Amino acid sequence: YSGELWNYRRLCELNAVFYHNNTALLYLFPVDCFKAFRQVYILTYMFDAQVQRYYYNFYGAKFEYIGVAGDNVSNYHFVPELTVSDNEQFAKHITIEDGVTLNAIGEKPFSLSVSWYDKNIKTYSTGIKNNIYNFFHNKSKTPSNKNLWTVFKQYKSAIQGKGYAKSFLSCNARATNAYSDRTAVAYMCNIFFNPILKNFFEQKGVRIEEDKWALSELLQFLFRSGIRKGEDIRLYIPSLRMRNLLKRWMVGMYDDKIDPENQEQIPIENKLEKAKALIDKYNLNDTSSDA
């Protein structure tokens, strides 16, 4: 057989296609590719929140968390205990735009999500463009070559504007250092996990951490900017949901350490006390003003 369904046949033979709820065909990378190795090491951050953890849980793959110790490339090494990152060292480099006017568009839980843009892009495109321009021109006061912005790619043309049009980077960009000189960032997304994929995994008993997944995606994008080199950045993130996820991360309210056996979060001692101190130190309370 060599017809138009040939590719589907090939994937089915690899046991890589699933028919979900009589509505969708889902492709999952063949797990046998991982089983072919005696050991596989994955260097990543917030693994518990990522699709690949859901994938391994789905297939019943066994994994364990280990850490990395050392302070430079000459002495990095694996250690038995997971290394908990010190988010404070990054928090001190992030200034979040908390002005009421600029952030009003993102107050509702689903504002600036894909479904929200689908329904509202014609109504709000001019206002969003004005907000982004206002942020770069009047708040961060940065030249265009220091700006970085993102939105879901299908809406890029509708809201790109003067002074930042050429500074776009896809919100799911990975493995690029080309924007590590950017110090002003406009993040115009409110990210939610694909509902079909979420339902597929949950029906199979896989735990989905949607907020942590959204935070992981946000952090991946932010670390394309100058913060990856320890530079200060100014951030416009009008979605209240995404902004609060980031603020909680900044004060250590999320960590990546879980027990793979029962998948329960392992508490960190004194986390709340430390968080309160950092909230005061960095003025991270969500008391917005136009100042």
Residue spans of the language-model regions?
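BZIP DNA-binding basic region
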Residues: 265-291
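A short acidic, often aromatic-flanked loop/helix-cap motif at beta-alpha or helix-coil junctions
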Residues: 69-76, 174-178, 193, 243, ...
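Positively charged, amphipathic N-terminal segments that serve as targeting/anchoring signals
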Residues: 1-169
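C-terminal/domain-terminus segments
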Residues: 56-65, 235-267
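Conserved RecA-like P-loop NTPase helicase motor core
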Residues: 163-245, 252
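Alpha-helical structural motif
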Residues: 128, 214-217, 271
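Surface-exposed polar/charged interaction patches
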Residues: 138-139, 252, 256, 278-285
